[in-house]
């Protein structure tokens, strides 16, 4: 018997089918093969058509089932991971009223800023744990003002994962975790935030019924089953945003555990066992997948924009022509820790939330024409990225998160020995690398929700550990010294 996971990304839809007994992936596919388009009608806007996601899901699902050589009756449950914060609006016929305003669209920033000021910063942070910012509620406020005809026709609002679940099951439901990422959830009262809804003038009727993150959220309809080759009544038993789901995929569920990614941008996602917030709003706090009223489990999310994109820029523009990433790592390894005094601040991909939304751009410090080479630049870029991670993780420490372990997929910058050693050394934390992805995590989440697995520990018992990186005492001291120099240069630049 099998479990199916869908990962609804902004670039593609990924589907994995997992054998429930072995926990191994037996089939996977993704679509589109080229990156999905994002429409930007104006600077700072970003939209996608939710019906395109649904088309991609159907293609990827059929492809994964074909590769796995399974039939619909073999699939016991479906789980969904999705790009966070996007706004989908539908009418009473469940028809999409406008393109989705997705996570990277910034048009709603002024609405969130005004709400933060008018509701009160302290009250927002103590109840919502965040500023309303550029999140889903603020995106809806933009529609209310600029597209009132559409707003008046809205039956329900949804996140991207809610929409795909609706297309599969015909049911419109959401989760506490989803409402919290939209900044609709009052953590102090454990309920929909009446204060925020009243401030924006939203009717409670717009909000979907709440279901558990793990548990029955709907069943595949007869028409969808016939179209996709699924069995009618196949349950959808899990959904979560991509970052909480990535943490689940890495079995990051308890306080002190950290999930990290090092792609174009970087994410550090830590679990906090206390209801807490950053008074400067440098990180965001949402309900984690296993958060309940009885057991606090909050996901503290730190995003760093300038991560893999800096390493890629160095490869294209500074490194010797034709070099690959492994060769770039070898080149960087010829330079000592600290790069003979050279530092790079990796903030050249837009404003950074952990710097209180300041856009300071990327900059090079301590450059000496008689000492420094391309190799120094290659290493300083990776060290600068690591030090940005450390800077953000120190904010998490201030919030009371005692970081015990960092878990990541064996991909992107975590393939670099320099990056791994530097991160372990400067944070004094063990790094564990695993072979997993979001669609696999969603499939296993479905297994938990369907009761096939007793708990996450059983679901992820087969999680394959690729590597463990321990902090090296001598190197750690050198990295910590280099970090202090980097941090001083950052503070002079802010």
For each predicted feature, which ranges?
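N-terminal glycine/serine-rich phosphate-binding loop of ATP-dependent small-molecule kinases
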Residues: 1-98, 110, 114, 126, ...
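Active-site core segments that coordinate phosphate-bearing ligands/cofactors
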Residues: 3-5, 17, 109, 116-173, ...
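Active-site donor-binding loop signature of nucleotide-sugar glycosyltransferases
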Residues: 31-33, 212, 471
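Flexible loop residues that form catalytic
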Residues: 83, 215, 411
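Carbohydrate-associated surface elements
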Residues: 105
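Divalent-metal (Mg2+/Mn2+/Ca2+)-assisted nucleotide/phosphate chemistry catalytic cores
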Residues: 204
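Short linear loop/turn motifs
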Residues: 208-216, 328-331
């Amino acid at each position: 018997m099998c479990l199916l996971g869908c990962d609804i990304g902004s670039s593609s839809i990924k589907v994995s089918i997992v054998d429930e007994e072995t926990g191994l992936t037996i089939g996977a596919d993704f679509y589109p093969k080229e990156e999905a388009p994002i429409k930007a009608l104006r600077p700072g806007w970003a939209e996608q058509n939710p019906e395109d996601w649904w088309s991609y899901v159907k293609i990827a699902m059929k492809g994964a089932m074909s590769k796995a050589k399974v039939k619909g009756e073999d699939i016991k449950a479906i789980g969904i991971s999705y790009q966070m914060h996007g706004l989908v609006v539908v009418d009473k016929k469940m028809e999409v009223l406008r393109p989705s305003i997705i996570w990277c669209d910034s048009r709603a920033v002024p609405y969130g800023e005004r709400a933060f000021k008018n509701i009160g910063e302290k009250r927002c942070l103590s109840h919502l744990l965040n500023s309303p910012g550029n999140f889903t509620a603020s995106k809806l406020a933009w529609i209310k003002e600029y597209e009132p005809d559409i707003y008046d026709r809205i039956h329900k609002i949804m996140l991207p994962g809610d929409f795909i679940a609706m297309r599969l099951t015909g049911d419109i439901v959401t989760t506490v975790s989803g409402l919290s990422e939209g900044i609709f959830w009052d953590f102090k009262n454990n309920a929909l935030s009446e204060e925020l809804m009243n401030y924006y003038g939203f009717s409670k009727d717009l909000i979907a019924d709440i279901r558990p993150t793990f548990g029955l959220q709907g069943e595949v309809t007869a028409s969808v089953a016939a179209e996709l080759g699924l069995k009618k009544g196949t349950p959808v038993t899990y959904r979560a945003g991509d970052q909480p789901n990535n943490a689940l995929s890495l079995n990051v569920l308890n306080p002190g555990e950290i999930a990290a990614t090092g792609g174009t941008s970087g994410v550090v996602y830590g679990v906090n066992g206390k209801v807490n917030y950053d008074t400067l709003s440098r990180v965001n706090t949402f309900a984690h997948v296993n958060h309940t009223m009885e057991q606090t489990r909050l996901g503290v999310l730190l995003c760093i924009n300038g991560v893999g994109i800096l390493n890629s820029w160095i490869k294209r523009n500074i490194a010797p022509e034709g070099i690959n990433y492994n060769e770039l790592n070898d080149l960087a390894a010829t330079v000592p820790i600290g790069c003979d005094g050279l530092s790079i601040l990796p903030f050249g991909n837009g404003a950074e939330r952990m710097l209180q939304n300041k856009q300071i751009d990327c900059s090079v410090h301590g450059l000496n024409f008689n000492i420094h080479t391309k190799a120094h630049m290659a290493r300083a870029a990776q060290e600068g990225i690591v030090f940005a991670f450390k800077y953000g993780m120190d904010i998490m420490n201030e919030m009371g998160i005692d970081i015990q372990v960092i878990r990541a997929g064996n991909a992107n910058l975590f393939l670099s020995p320099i990056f791994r050693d530097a991160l372990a050394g400067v944070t004094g934390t063990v790094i564990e690398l695993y072979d997993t992805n979001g669609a696999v995590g969603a499939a296993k989440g479905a297994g938990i929700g369907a009761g096939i697995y007793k708990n996450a520990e059983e679901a992820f018992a087969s999680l394959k550990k690729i590597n463990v990186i321990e902090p090296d005492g001598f190197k750690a001291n050198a990295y910590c010294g280099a970090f202090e120099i980097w941090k001083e240069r950052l503070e002079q630049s802010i």
